[in-house]
Amino acid sequence: MEGESYNESTVNGTPVNHQALERHGLWEVITIAVVTAVVSLMTIVGNVLVMISFKVNSQLKTVNNYYLLSLACADLIIGIFSMNLYTTYILMGRWVLGSLACDLWLALDYVASNASVMNLLVISFDRYFSITRPLTYRAKRTPKRAGIMIGLAWLVSFILWAPAILCWQYLVGKRTVPPDECQIQFLSEPTITFGTAIAAFYIPVSVMTILYCRIYRETEKRTKDLADLQGSDSVAEAKKREPAQRTLLRSFFSCPRPSLAQRERNQASWSSSRRSTSTTGKTTQATDLSADWEKAEQVTTCSSYPSSEDEAKPTTDPVFQMVYKSEAKESPGKESNTQETKETVVNTRTENSDYDTPKYFLSPAAAHRLKSQKCVAYKFRLVVKADGTQETNNGCRKVKIMPCSFPVSKDPSTKGPDPNLSHQMTKRKRMVLVKERKAAQTLSAILLAFIITWTPYNIMVLVSTFCDKCVPVTLWHLGYWLCYVNSTINPICYALCNRTFRKTFKLLLLCRWKKKKVEEKLYWQGNSKLP
């Protein structure tokens, strides 16, 4: 494969490679066979676990893992065929399976290896576009599209290598390698070898490295932006807890509380004033009564409410403590100065959240008309006191309003947008960023393993182009085998970087996956029977 030649002699018509027999002692052969067999077994088991995990665990059926599944298929082919055939070729020192088997093996080996590179390239572009174009690209990022990209990766790899490997001898008219050697015929020219190394390894690795650097920078930038967003949310939360500073105090007129009969007469007079607007005298008298009614019941609120975007939790709103002079009598002819405290709730109409507009106690008729309109509840604590207040000419007394803090649960119908929306959006961004970072970590591990395992062999390819005898045969074997080891490392990278893969591997290796599925089924059946 690497182009090395062996000294042969013929014994009874059968070629014997003395150099191959002398190169490796018995224990060396046993050691090489055991080590390579173990690595091959690990590669097969690891990549089969990836496939089974993808099959049995629905959480792993994501678009990104479809690419990992394709990579596992390529690695499985290498673990089953390439590793074992190449080990046999090394230990025997020559190819004994014939030229057709050699060409088929080389075609399968190079197509699978190039498919691994193409899959890594697709994964890198997928991660890059997911990070840099989250809105436009993710809408198109479907399993069907992933399947098309995977199919193209394998198709391109097949077109690049299979026809040239299988048909080269027919194009040039003869086989250009000896029958006991197994290597690609058209790579006997140093310039072609150099060009294929550049195209198959160095260019893809350079592109993947550039993409990963951009992915890393963009991920760090989004992490910083998320930290700034969380900081602004903390500032808003702190401002929300601060008490309102802007308070406007006004006063209102308080009249002696009338008896039940007097209130009924006032209401009748107020109602009659609306019906008799054409009579001048009656209208004047009714208007005076209505004015007394409205003046006595006029009240002004304070504008000490937090802004709408800060209404994430029930806030502490001002409650007005009103001083009210009561002249209610216990019996005819006898006044009572008894102090009484009463708490009432007044529903006042709100428009455009203008809390500075004066509100009114409404008559029953007006309240009925406003029943279907949006209102906000205010609580008033009426404290009856016997001290003197300023009395007006119509018997009403001017009373001050003193604000005090009292927790009030706002009516949900009066709230603006969902108060937890900002927090939910931040949490969603954080979850997306965590997933992106995990995917980037998986990509970085796979890319690093690929570069470490493939670089030595491709460096030797470049060196051999200019100096054919500078690379020892042992280094050729070791470098080529190291490329195969990449297929063993990839499943380990999945398990180390993805917790779901790791847990699924563990359950499958311990033969507990079926038990887990049964337990989950029994759990859901038990929950479905609950009332």
UniProtKB/Swiss-Prot annotation:
Q: Where is the composition biased (Low complexity)?
A: 267-287
Claim: Cytoplasm is one of the keywords in the record: no
Keywords (alphabetical) are: Cell membrane, Disulfide bond, G-protein coupled receptor, Glycoprotein, Membrane, Phosphoprotein, Postsynaptic cell membrane, Receptor, Synapse, Transducer, Transmembrane, Transmembrane helix
Question: Transmembrane residues, as ranges?
Answer: 29-52, 66-86, 104-125, 146-168, 191-213, 443-463, 478-497
Pfam families to which the protein is assigned, alphabetical: 7tm_1
PROSITE patterns, alphabetized: G_PROTEIN_RECEP_F1_1, G_PROTEIN_RECEP_F1_2
SUPFAM superfamilies membership? Family A G protein-coupled receptor-like
The entry sums up its family as follows:
Belongs to the G-protein coupled receptor 1 family. Muscarinic acetylcholine receptor subfamily. CHRM5 sub-subfamily.
Q: What is this protein called?
A: Muscarinic acetylcholine receptor M5
Q: What is the lineage of its organism?
A: Eukaryota, Metazoa, Chordata, Craniata, Vertebrata
